[in-house]
Structure formats: C-alpha cells, structure tokens
Amino acid sequence: MQIHKLCFLVLFLANAAFAVKFNFDSFDGSNLLFLGDAELGPSSDGVSRSGALSMTRDENPFSHGQGLYINQIPFKPSNTSSPFSFETSFTFSITPRTKPNSGQGFAFIITPEADNSGASDGGYLGILNKTNDGKPENHILAIEFDTFQNKEFLDISGNHVGVNINSMTSLVAEKAGYWVQTRVGKRKVWSFKDVNLSSGERFKAWVEFRNKDSTITVTLAPENVKKPKRALIEAPRVLNEVLLQNMYAGFAGSMGRAVERHDIWSWSFENAAKNN
C-alpha cells in the first residue's frame, strides 16, 4: 500500500514538473520571441494596436514573421510517449490594408525550433517553404486562419480554417464560421453562421487536444460570443507522431502582394501534464 502511494507521489511530482499554464490579456514582449517581422503592434500606425502581437509589417513587401512563447513547452513525457492534453485560446483580428484583395493569413503553430530563417512568405504563412513542405520530419502543427485561396495547397476558399500537419495543405479545413444552437418547438437545431476573417473584427479561437482519444478540435466565434458548444473542426489521431517532448508554441503569419495586419490581442495556454 505504501509502495503504491509512493509510486503515485513520484508520478504526480514528475507530471507536475511538466505542467505549463499562462494567460496574457495583452503583450509587453517580455515572454515572447520575435522572429522575422514579428513585433509588438505600435500605437503610432493609426489602428490602435498597442499591446498586440503582430506577425507582419505594412512597410515590408511579402512580410512574414513568428511570435513564440519564450520557453519550450512540454508536450510529451518523452519523444516515444503519448502527448499530454492541452488547450489554448486567443483573440485575433486580420485587417486588410489594400483592397479588394487580402492575404495571406496566420496560424497558431507548435514547432520544434525557434527559427524561421527558412520560412517563406505568401501561402507558406511564414512557417515552411517549397523545399520542406510536406516532410514528416518537420514536426509542425499549424491551425491556419487563411484569407487567400492558394490552389497549389488545395485551399477550399480564401476564408477558411484548417488543421495542417507538416504541410501547408490542410488535413481538414472548413469555411470560417461558427455553430449556433436554437430551439424550434421541442427540437434543438444547429445553424451555421459565416464570418469574414479579414473583416478587421476581433474573433476568438479555441484549440484543444484530448489525450484520451487523440482528437484535436478547433472552435471559432466573434470575440463577444460565448464559446460555441459545437466545434468548427474535429480531427482525430493526428498528433501522436507530430509532437515531440519539448516544443515552442505561438503564431506565424505572412503577406503576399496584398497587405494585411495579423494581430493577436490575448492568449492563454495550459497543458494537462499534472492530470495525466
């Protein structure tokens, strides 16, 4: 009995050492790594972006960058084990600076390296490039919020959300929007509401991974709307071979010929290492 208690305590303490939790209501730069053109949004650019994390700069053609949490985050007890459950949420806005076109979008990313020196702009979203796109050794998860239809990546539209594994071609993609449940008589009915990602409005996204069934879900809604009970995307069994023991998490974004701003206004993250 005592041995069982001791084993449980050792396991609990070991898992607690892996636990990570943070919540940024705004950013001051002290807990972030800025790669490429990523920066804290200046208050002097006419769109009141002070305190936002931005991946691109208007003055730089084909701008791209990454903003990552300063420390690596444990996603597995070891490289050969199953991933911890985790959940993250963030508010963002995408604002076109040239009309009528927008592009290209941004993504929440989990990546093994804090290095975007080989990343490309345009449809590669500042994450990958033509040479390494699609390679399993990338070990990259990207939840993309895409505002330009790149046919070479089989994009379903110029306004969609996708789950990408080691590639800019989405494993699963859905048009941008959210589900609303209403009561019609005695029945509950789901209806879908479209949103325009590049409207300049603020949206909130939730990304959750469940260890018990290896499923990742993505949920989206306008900032002032309560989290929908139905996810926009549900992708099963995609992360076991992708995630490594320690990785970086954050955001990447890029522009093509059209100029748009990608601003992250708040961000929270928690892994469930202490509960595994």
Swiss-Prot record:
GO terms for cellular component: apoplast; cytosol; nucleus. GO terms for biological process: response to chitin; response to oomycetes. Glycans are attached at residues 79, 129, 196. Induction: By oligogalacturonides and chitin (e.g. chito-octamer and crab-shell chitin CSC). Accumulates upon Hyaloperonospora arabidopsidis infection, during both early and late stages of infection. Residues 1-19 form the signal peptide. Keywords: Apoplast, Glycoprotein, Lectin, Secreted, Signal. It is found in: Secreted, Extracellular space, Apoplast. Gene3D superfamilies: 2.60.120.200. It comes from the Eukaryota. InterPro entries: ConA-like_dom_sf, L-lectin, Legume_lectin_dom, Leguminous_Lectin. Belongs to the leguminous lectin family. This is Lectin-like protein At3g16530. It comes from Arabidopsis thaliana (Mouse-ear cress).
